Amino acid sequence: PRVIQISLGVFLLLVFSSWGFSSHRCIHDAAIQALPDPLYSFFKSHRDWIVLHAVDADLRKHRLIGEAEKHFIDLDLYGFSLDSLKRYFPRKQEDAKRIFGDSTLNANGIGPWSVKQTYYRLVASFSEGDEAQILRNASDLGHYVSDLHVPLHTTSNYNGVRTGQQGIHSLWETQLPELFIESYNLTPGIHSHLPFARYFKNSENCIWEALIASHQAIDSVLYFEAMLSQEMGRTTTYAYVERGRTQQRMRSPEFAKRYHQALNGQVERRMQKAIYTVSSLWYSAWIDAGQPE
């Protein structure tokens, strides 16, 4: 097994990246380390570009119509119980369109189908030997996959507005990783139990398994935040935290610490799973393309 070290350049990217971007970049960087040779060597040679562009899909949301719905799916709006969701929800986009209609799908998010489409674009890029498109599609695929590993990307209560928990999305996805990422075990190696990439014969099943696991975690994401907010009171739940040259009102460092403890490693586990899934889908796309040199 190879020993993993995050380069200084990548570390600086993580430290100085925009609000909400550091987790995506970290996942892409770690996913590269999980690849087997010869794919590892190719991705490593383009490591800085892939990590830098891990957030391109987010940047497009503000200027490209049709991009925003690729990052989520509000499963709760379809009225399925969790068990029924696993058994009966249409996993193929054509089936879902026929049942619910195009407008409903777009309004509720097309996250898993966006992953599938981007996966096949990556396969095509590998087959054609188009290096620029390989890098672009790999970066986008990693971003969409990572988003589906965030529980709040699978619910219409995306930012806690429906339950009076505004700001919970950035708390879970950004504030906790920024504060505690140094304690996370995120890359495979000699001293890690984390798996390297493997080939997924059925990429669609892999995508939906990750999505369902995220959706199952929503209750705990919301419950522990609500419990701590009630316990700590408004004055200690929030604080003005310095970010760059500004101060932003967000959950206090003490609240974030206790929330981190209550979740018992949940954010770390979802990041670990995202890294494994991203690297495995990159690898699977290369295999499906015929393992081009």
Residue spans for each PLM region:
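Bacterial Sec-dependent N-terminal signal peptides
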Residues: 1-26
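N-terminal, motif-rich segments that launch catalysis or mediate targeting to/interaction with membranes
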Residues: 17-140, 156-293
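Extended, hydrophobic/aromatic-rich amphipathic alpha-helical segments that build helical scaffolds
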Residues: 139-147
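Catalytic Zn2+-binding segment of zinc metalloproteases
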Residues: 146-160
